[in-house]
Amino acid sequence: MGDQRVHKPRTAKTRTLRVNRILLPMLLLFSGETTSVVTQLFSVDSSGLGISLMQSVAIALNASSLALANNTAWPLQHEPPEDRLEIESYDYIVVGAGSAGSIVASRLSELCQVKVLLLEEGQLPPLESEIFGLTGALHHDERYMFLEEAVPNPKCCQAMASMHGCVWWHGRMMGGGGAINGNIFIPGSRENFRRWNSTGWDWTQVHKTYSRLQQRLNPSYLQPNKLNLKLANLIYSGSAELGVPRMKQPLIAGATFGYTHHVPVTVNQRRRASSARLYLANDQVNRRGNLKVIRGAQVQRVLLNAAGSRATGVIYTLNGVEHTAKTLGEVILSAGTLNSAKLLLLSGIGPREELQRWNITTHQDLPVGRNLQDHGMMPLFLLFGSNCAVNSTRDPTENPYAPVSITQYLLDNQKGPLASGFYMMGYINSSSPSSSRGEPDLHVVAHTLLPKGSTGSFGYLGFRPELIQAQQDILQKGDLLQIMGSLLRPLSHGKVSLSSKNSADQAKIENHYGEAVEDQQTLLRYVRYIQKLSKTRPFRRCGLRLWKPPLHECDTLAADSDDYWLCYIRYFYVGAWHSVGTCRMAPRKGVDSQENGGVVDERLRVHGVKGLRVVDASIMPELPAGNTNGPAMMIGEKGAQMILDDREANNEVIQEC
């Protein structure tokens, strides 16, 4: 008989195999040479079946990853004429493809007879923007974010790195902030819109717009993992001991009290979905020849006629070359709360004294940039003193970055830890947490478990190096529960003005977080509420106790005194990136001495300028009681409908594509 010795395949070293198991799913995301990748990673002989099976999985992974990263659904990039003297003309020019602007451009281009130009400074959103478990990687990436700072203010944001002011992040890509924020879709409440006090914007009218919007968005709920469900139950049981209930009805910010982890978000096939993804990235829109999209376009200013009474177009730069686009219809600014205000100022629309400072001709004296508002947020930390049901058991398969999670996401229809998420929200009357009367004034949100040994959250927030180190040191001892408190109706407002006449420079931002005495008192009540929560039986079972970061200025004050916590507020009450209000909707001559009237009317038309509207969160007279992304999309939908209605009012025959 011949040699019947068993063939012993070559085996990779254990360490190499472990690394290869980690690298395999990631390499296959970008590799088309599946056979060679598999054989190189697993240096073994095979009769064929093993390699064939691995190759089949690799091909499936590769196909799934390519489909996930597919950008062909987006409208093609339009190239303006090379000859700068050849000026294109459009019926509508929309500036900004964010949460509102994407909807406006899509809705207007439904009319076949109109030409629409959409100008967006950013580019296509990256893969990470559509995966809940990966979006955090983009939050310091200037390719996709405007990382702007306010003027340093000794009365707020003192925890920021030396000589830095509060950070104001906003999106810089198709989808804008909606492509990078929490995708939370909360409408606001009836009372919110009553206080706006604008014709056509009461709850009855706004609710109709939300109903139309929700048919397209189809908001749904994230699936939390087991660990987050345990955390939710800890919050539910602890807050119940204080008389704060678990919400039984759907979440309506500002109208319901209590806690819930059933927070609606905008998703599409288990992927994060901005309004740009839902309204622009589809074949139906791509077939429209009347919609032109230019990415990477930085708008310099709006062109006005000699009298400053009509918008006639915009000037923008693309790849360093200046272009002009004209319109016989309208320019719609949807560039966001900071940039829409900046563009109006650069165009000669704003406070006269501000424009004179920069030698800009004043076409319309309006309070542009005033009334800047943000919910703000302040973190408090509870250190786990012992293992409990919340943090004692962690399933390694629930790590979103584990190879098994990546493989599951790609092969199992975008399921698994990468697709999961967790939002826990509480709406509370800080004066009487157990009361359900009146309106909540405190939003307790983002109950985040910072695991032992992790890098923590201070680096992400841009805090001082010594604070980052202190948090990392305490995380060597145990897990931290981070809780954010946010004011639903802050009285401290800021403003936006120009830092130069160059449109490429960020606006000058002045904020005053927590300076109003009423805001300070609400934040103090928030601290006392969390202290009471930490003393409930469920929290005591986990050994949870308050951890206070070292603050030399504050630590010299009496421990746990109001003075100490007011000092803490000056350091840690920072931006929540919910900016609104700089192009306030109100009559031109308002009686409100602080804001001195409005910038746009109830149909979002800039006072005194025909053919110019602002359609984004900057028009909000005051903050909604919750996240601003949903209301911003509502404004986009309602603003687009107003423009379409105005065409019908002119007896034009509407022809839809």
Swiss-Prot record:
Keyword Flavoprotein among record annotations: yes
Single Gene Ontology MF annotation: oxidoreductase activity
Co-factor requirement: FAD
Secretion signal span: none
Keywords: FAD, Flavoprotein, Oxidoreductase
Domain of life where this protein originates: Eukaryota
Annotated SUPFAM superfamilies: FAD-linked reductases, C-terminal domain, FAD/NAD(P)-binding domain
Expression induction or repression: Induced by RH-0345, which is an ecdysone agonist used as insecticide.
Catalysed reactions, as listed in the record: ecdysone + O2 = 3-dehydroecdysone + H2O2
Family: Belongs to the GMC oxidoreductase family.
Task of the protein: Involved in the inactivation of ecdysteroid molting hormones by converting ecdysteroids into 3-dehydroecdysteroids.
The protein, known as: Ecdysone oxidase
Species this protein is from: Drosophila melanogaster (Fruit fly)
Lineage: Eukaryota, Metazoa, Ecdysozoa, Arthropoda, Hexapoda
Gene: Eo
